[in-house]
Structures are given as C-alpha cells and as structure tokens.
Amino acid sequence: MKLLRKQMLLCSILFLVFTLSACSAIGQTDENNLTDSATSAKKTVSVVRGTITPTVSTQTTIVPAVPFIISSPENGIFNTAVELEEKITAGQIIGTVNGKELKSPVDGTITSIAPSNESVPSNYPVAIVHYTGFALNVEADNFLSTLPEYAELKAKFQVYDGVGPTDMIAVVSPAADENAFTGIVPQEGILQCLISQTVDVKSGQSATVVITATTRNDVLILPLSVIAGRQGTGLVTVITPNGERVETKVTLGVTDGANIEILSGLEEGDVVSATPPNLDPRGI
C-alpha cells in the first residue's frame, strides 16, 4: 500500500514538472514573438548616395508600327534634306535646325516634311517617318515627366513564351492621326518601341518591354517601398536621433522600379522608417 502511494506521489510530481516546463516554453515563445514584432516594427533604412537607371516596364501587345515624329530640338530655321515620299535609311539626315542635324533612327519613308527656311519652335514636328515593321507601344507619361527633353532611350522586349530578350532598334514618338485642325501632333505620353524586321514576331503576341534612360550617378536614393506617393512628391517618416518620428515631404525624381531618386526633403544619412506613413498603424 505504501509502495502504491509512493508511485502515485512520484507520478504527480513528474506531471507537475512537465506542466511547469511546458508553460515556461510557451511563455518564452510568446516573449520571442513579441520581441520579433517589436523589432520588425522598428525597421529603418538610411538615405544613401548611389546610381539609378530610370526604368519603365509593362506588358503589352505587338502591333504594326504607326508613323513617328521627328521634332525640332530648339527654336530656329529648319532646312530640309529630303523630299516627300522619299525612302530613307537609318542614320540619314532629314534636315537641320540652326545647323544641328536631325536624323532618322530607322529605315523608312518620309510621309510629311516641313518646308525649308521655315522658322520653327522647339519641339515642333518637322517630319513624319513611316517604318514598315512591328512595334510595342508603352504609356510612359510619368516616366517621361522625370526625364530631360530628348533623353536617350533604349529598350528590350521579351515575347511571352517566345523570342527574347531582344534589343529594340529605336524608341520614338508616334504621330496621332493628322487632320486640318490639329496638324501633326504626337500621341501624348506614348512611346513606340520599334522591332527590327529581322526578328520573327507577329501582330497580337504578348510581350514585356523595358525602357531605360541614361544612368544617373551620385544621387540620393531610397527604396520605393518606404514612400507614400510615387509621382512628383511623397511622404516618409524620418526617425530623428532622439527617436522622434517626423512625417516629411520629399520631392521625387526617377525610379528604376525598386528605388527612387530623392531630389529634396532629405539628406544623406537620414534615417527613415521602412513603413510608409500611410501604412503605419501607429501613425505619427
């Protein structure tokens, strides 16, 4: 009988030990989870200097190219070097403005040309060229607004389950339908990426196109994910040395899809919350 009582007492003690150990482990796990959450909430990034390549990408459809515009780079006198309906080759001079040569980026046909000795303003369409081939059209209004006039643009494309990645032969401004009231005008905010005639594609194929401009060096950059806002201006949460959280307005420049250029509002070394103000449940 005494032996039975001892066995029961021993079992009770062992059960109590296991129960306390389990509670301790659960408590430790909960504490670690709280610590991880606190650490995650306190994540920050610093404003750094670096390089960034302005980039825009989208998925679109291959279509026959439409005529594109060649514009005057400045105010001045335009003199033509070609005739209407003339067949031209890539790199051929089509005219000059104040002595500056205007060249066609591709082979094509001149379908419209301004008269010689004509005074033209900057950005005035002086010629329309028809390229016989395929193209990809990209809505790039926001992208273009961050770039200087006549920025050098390059593009590559990848056909879905097909050819690529392949260089585009030119990035141009497509012409809108001309009429007696509007004259020659570009399609606003649209870039037309021309595909070489030697590349085997067909109309209607889906493709991803990536357009890039000249890389900018030694600029202030932050990850896109920390900013509320994407175009022109945005908001970030600056963490001061004493831990104060300050909602700060910033002026934004070009982006490569992952990072964005900071034009004003922050300085190199500033510490910013990794959570943008509009997504931070704690507020400011």
Q: Model features per residue range: what roles?
A:
Residues 28-36, 63, 175-189, 241-242, ...:
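Gly/Ser-enriched beta-turn/beta-hairpin loop segments
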Residues 30, 34-77, 92, 274:
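N-terminal beta-strand block that forms a small beta-sandwich/beta-barrel module immediately after a flexible targeting
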Residues 24-28, 152-160, 185-186, 193-284:
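Edge-of-domain interaction segments
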Residues 19-22:
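C-terminal motif of bacterial Sec signal peptides marking the signal peptidase cleavage site
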Residues 73-93, 111-125, 194, 259-265:
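Short histidine-centered loop motifs in beta-beta connectors
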Residues 53-63, 68-75, 100-107, 137-139, ...:
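Small beta-strand-rich domains/subdomains or short beta-sheet motifs embedded
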